């Protein structure tokens, strides 16, 4: 009988990375590895890193060092870096961080089991030389579907294992660009990749250089994966990619998302479909209509504004201004008054003036966003903005970050207060123990996992994870809502 091999996956970063980890888990489980939750119980600890901004990279390095410490006591024998930071820096990361026994890029994912076994046996797998992955795909989007470039979340052209040959809980390969997958956890919410990469050239962003150009997954693969997730008990699916508004452009139909969403909403067992990562400049009336009027599709708009001062946006290689962005939000709310809206912003961008900051404040005050993320600008090697003049000093960036973050906290708390009295459809996600008993936690249509607020129920009576219930918002705790389960609210009347 083969010796038991155990592996733990530690995931940092965004929902796209979570999907990649579940792909790696599926590949490893299909090849006989036992997945464990705690890295201290694993022969190999695989850290799925994030390479987005400096703080995320630091967190990734810290996680690798923490995993390395486990080798001094307990079962752990090897630590391996995967993910965006590993792909972005390759052998440079391996040289800078000898504590990692291996640094694997996206091209290694299809052979992840063999790679880990080699490392576990004391062998060495040479790390890749970093390269610009945008150059691996044709310039024309229409020519990208037939390429054989490794794309996390998209299986390659390979013979599909028979379902009976796969361990329980592993999704079978459904064809080209639909990966093996094994769920890591029991949450009633799961992400599904619509696409990989990005064709935009924002001057501050390095993501396209290591995630590559934009390429869509085929609708049939997205549907099959969603059906499988429903069979696993998932109630809400969140569609993720670097830019969901571009979905279908390489498949000959830029409006493919408008067609796909109703089909996903019709999958048996799925209670909610949520779309994330939308570009304001690419929003179109038909997409807004589908997002605001399709049953089971959340009227939720994760819009990547980044700033609202025209001069700053131009320097970012982006489009828009305060008034056009406010008009977009007005259009959305005219169709769905309770629609959720969130965004992220960068402050302290090179050349940003006090007037630009005031313009951003004007937008934030008028936008009534449910959730706001604020980041201070930092240079990312390989981006256009690194060479910009008129850079702000670190103290000024820190001051502006603190100021806008405080404003964002106040505004999102006010927005939560505006929602008191609303009737909400809430997906119960967990029941947690507190000093005075158990409390049920969920999220309404305007609240995405991890990044946004949540709903705290006044009682957990009759509530279990995975249940979709109607509730009335009766109070707030910062950006979170306090709500009564609808049946209890009726009794109270």
UniProtKB/Swiss-Prot annotation:
[4Fe-4S] cluster 1 binds at residues 14, 50, 84. It is found in: Cytoplasm. It comes from the Bacteria. Keywords: 4Fe-4S, Cytoplasm, Iron, Iron-sulfur, Metal-binding, S-adenosyl-L-methionine, Transferase. InterPro entries: Elp3/MiaA/NifB-like_rSAM, Methylthiotransferase, Methylthiotransferase_CS, Methylthiotransferase_N, Methylthiotransferase_N_sf, NA-bd_OB-fold, Ribosomal_uS12_MeSTrfase_RimO, rSAM. CDD domains: Radical_SAM (cd01335). GO terms for biological process: tRNA modification. Residues 5-121 form the MTTase N-terminal domain. Its EC number is 2.8.4.4. [4Fe-4S] cluster 2 binds at residues 198, 202, 205. GO terms for molecular function: 4 iron, 4 sulfur cluster binding; aspartic acid methylthiotransferase activity; metal ion binding; protein methylthiotransferase activity. Its main location: cytoplasm. It catalyses: L-aspartate(89)-[ribosomal protein uS12]-hydrogen + (sulfur carrier)-SH + AH2 + 2 S-adenosyl-L-methionine = 3-methylsulfanyl-L-aspartate(89)-[ribosomal protein uS12]-hydrogen + (sulfur carrier)-H + 5'-deoxyadenosine + L-methionine + A + S-adenosyl-L-homocysteine + 2 H(+). Residues 417-487 form the TRAM domain. It is an enzyme of class 2 (transferase). Residues 184-415 form the Radical SAM core domain. Its cofactor is [4Fe-4S] cluster. GO terms for cellular component: cytosol. It holds the Pfam family Radical_SAM. Binds 2 [4Fe-4S] clusters. One cluster is coordinated with 3 cysteines and an exchangeable S-adenosyl-L-methionine. Catalyzes the methylthiolation of an aspartic acid residue of ribosomal protein uS12. Belongs to the methylthiotransferase family. RimO subfamily. This is Ribosomal protein uS12 methylthiotransferase RimO. It comes from Streptomyces griseus subsp. griseus (strain JCM 4626 / CBS 651.72 / NBRC 13350 / KCC S-0626 / ISP 5235). The gene is rimO.
């Amino acid at each position: 009988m083969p010796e038991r091999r155990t592996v733990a996956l530690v995931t940092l970063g965004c929902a796209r990375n979570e999907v990649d980890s579940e792909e790696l888990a599926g590949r490893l489980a299909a090849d006989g590895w036992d997945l464990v939750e705690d890295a201290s119980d694993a022969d190999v600890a695989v850290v799925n890193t994030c390479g987005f901004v400096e703080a995320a990279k630091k967190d990734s390095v810290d996680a690798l060092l923490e995993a390395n410490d486990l080798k001094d006591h307990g079962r752990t024998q090897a630590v391996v870096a995967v993910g965006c930071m590993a792909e972005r820096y390759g052998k440079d990361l391996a040289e800078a961080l000898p504590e990692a026994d291996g640094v694997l890029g996206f091209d290694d994912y299809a052979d992840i089991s063999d790679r880990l076994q080699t490392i576990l046996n004391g062998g060495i797998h040479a790390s890749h030389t970093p390269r610009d992955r945008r150059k691996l795909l044709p310039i024309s989007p229409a020519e990208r579907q037939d390429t054989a470039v490794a794309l996390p979340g998209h299986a390659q052209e390979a013979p599909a294992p028979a379902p009976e040959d796969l361990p329980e809980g592993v999704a079978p390969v459904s064809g080209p660009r639909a990966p093996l997958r094994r769920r890591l956890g029991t949450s009633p919410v799961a992400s599904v990749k619509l696409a990989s990469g990005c064709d935009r050239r924002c001057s501050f962003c390095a993501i396209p250089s290591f995630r590559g150009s934009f390429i869509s997954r085929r609708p049939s693969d997205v549907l099959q994966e969603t059906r499988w997730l429903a069979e696993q008990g998932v109630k809400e699916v969140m569609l993720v990619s670097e830019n969901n508004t571009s979905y279908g452009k390489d498949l000959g139909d830029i409006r493919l998302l408008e067609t796909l969403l109703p089909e996903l909403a019709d999958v048996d067992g799925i209670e909610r479909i949520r779309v994330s990562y939308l570009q304001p400049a690419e929003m179109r009336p038909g997409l807004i209509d589908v997002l605001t009027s399709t049953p089971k599709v959340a009227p939720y708009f994760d819009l990547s504004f980044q700033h609202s001062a025209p001069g700053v946006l131009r320097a970012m290689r982006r489009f828009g201004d305060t008034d056009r962005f406010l008009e977009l939000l007005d259009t959305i709310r005219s169709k769905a008054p309770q629609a959720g809206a969130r965004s992220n912003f960068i402050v302290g961008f090179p050349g940003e003036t006090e007037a630009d900051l005031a313009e951003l404040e004007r937008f934030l005050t008028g936008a009534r966003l449910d959730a706001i993320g604020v980041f201070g600008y930092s240079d990312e090697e390989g981006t256009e903005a690194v060479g910009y003049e008129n850079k702000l000093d670190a103290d000024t960036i820190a001051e502006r970050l603190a100021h806008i973050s405080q404003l964002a906290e106040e505004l999102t708390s006010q927005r939560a207060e505006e929602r008191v009295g609303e009737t909400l459809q809430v997906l119960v996600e967990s029941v947690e123990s507190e000093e005075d008993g158990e409390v049920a936690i969920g999220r309404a249509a305007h609240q995405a996992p991890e990044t946004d607020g949540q709903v705290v129920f006044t009682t957990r009576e009759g509530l279990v994870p995975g249940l979709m219930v109607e509730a009335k918002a009766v109070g707030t705790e910062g950006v979170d809502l306090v709500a009564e389960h609808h049946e209890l609210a009726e009794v109270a009347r």
